[in-house]
């Protein structure tokens, strides 16, 4: 195509095998992949041509459409490229532009992207990667019919073409496309039997086609381009959209981070409203799991403990506890210390009797299966809910309560059962399962909460 052929910039009428006619300015021809690109394309539909699927014409003007050569039925040249007054071939001219355009031009010699014309690599992850659209023209010739700036570093005078030349050009163009191979990698991308890509934009910048032929003899230097500003603005908009589309809880988490004073320990927070369930996160590491370089040395760790001091401290605490129990028992029961609460299978003695084996013997398998280390209050009374809750917390730990936010659904009416003695997760809600420590459905307090029935301790229902 470097021989000065008048195809580039000509107005082309193209009919696909689907009997759809397109008109546009010839943009570029890829003989390797057998594709034709037209700019400023309009679709005129099937126009009463016999076809199974008639398609009406469209008013939209596409910036460019890339057609597959094997699916083109007919191609005719309607108008030659418009002749233009080019600057003289002066080596002092580095770059020139027309005043009517708004975007600056990147270097012809570097084959860089012009305006916002996407590269072929955006269309297919095939052998087209890296091939970009650069300057318009044949052997560096400039065109103004696209309404954009072009390089005038090397211009060819284009003579007027007669009607017979149009026919020869059309035949040669068809022959060139038929010789080129069809690219199977682009099959999943086409939306119709002919179009591979159709991009419709509202931008005033028209992309320029690739040079078909040799590179410009003068390698120009790219000037600071203003066409990169829309790209930066577009990326900035994408970043804003990405920020807006983040989950709301992540934003709340970031807001809480900003309010924490640097260096202060982060305590779990209770949400007070909205839909902030839970009391915060319990010690979740954000830097991933801990990495250990070597195995734990148990011998050196055990050597740090003084077993005698620990044993002495344990005995002191045990004696203090026994003294407290004796002081509490005497005014309540009015009698001496009774059974220690340890149920012996053979009923041999009580816990208040002196242990013949000494105070250091906490387990005697001859007397009982159970040990004598932990003895609770031996008074015959039921522990209060606070004591039982504290005991359960010491034994099993504090459970995670995901639904204990102060906002949300916490009403005492509603349709749910109320949690048991242990204050389960939700106090109301719609049919929430009780998660209390002791279970047991408590009676309703109003509303539609089965107020006609009373749930007793033994789970028997009385009318």
From Swiss-Prot:
Residues 232-258, 322-340 have a biased composition (Basic and acidic residues). The modification Phosphothreonine is found at residue 194. Residues 410-429 have a biased composition (Gly residues). The keyword Transferase does not apply. One of its GO terms (molecular function) is mRNA binding. The modification N-acetylserine is found at residue 2. Keywords: Acetylation, Cytoplasm, Cytoskeleton, Developmental protein, Methylation, Phosphoprotein, Repressor, Ribonucleoprotein, Translation regulation. GO terms for biological process: mitotic spindle assembly; negative regulation of translation; P-body assembly; stress granule assembly. CDD domains: LSm14_N (cd01736). Residues 284-320 form the DFDF domain. Residues 172-288, 322-359, 398-448 are annotated as: Disordered. It comes from the Eukaryota. The modification Phosphoserine is found at residues 178, 182-183, 192, 216, 227. A motif (TFG box) lies at residues 380-400. A motif (FFD box) lies at residues 361-377. Residues 269-283 have a biased composition (Basic residues). It is found in: Cytoplasm, P-body; Cytoplasm, Cytoskeleton, Spindle; Cytoplasm, Stress granule. InterPro entries: DFDF, FDF_dom, FFD_box, Lsm14-like_N, LSM_dom_sf, Sm, TFG_box. GO terms for cellular component: cytoplasm; cytoplasmic stress granule; mitotic spindle; P-body; ribonucleoprotein complex. Residues 172-185, 194-203, 217-231 have a biased composition (Polar residues). Essential for formation of P-bodies, cytoplasmic structures that provide storage sites for translationally inactive mRNAs and protect them from degradation. Acts as a repressor of mRNA translation. May play a role in mitotic spindle assembly. The LSM14 domain and the RGG repeats are required for accumulation in P-bodies, and the region containing the FDF motif is responsible for cytoplasmic retention. This is Protein LSM14 homolog A. It comes from Bos taurus.
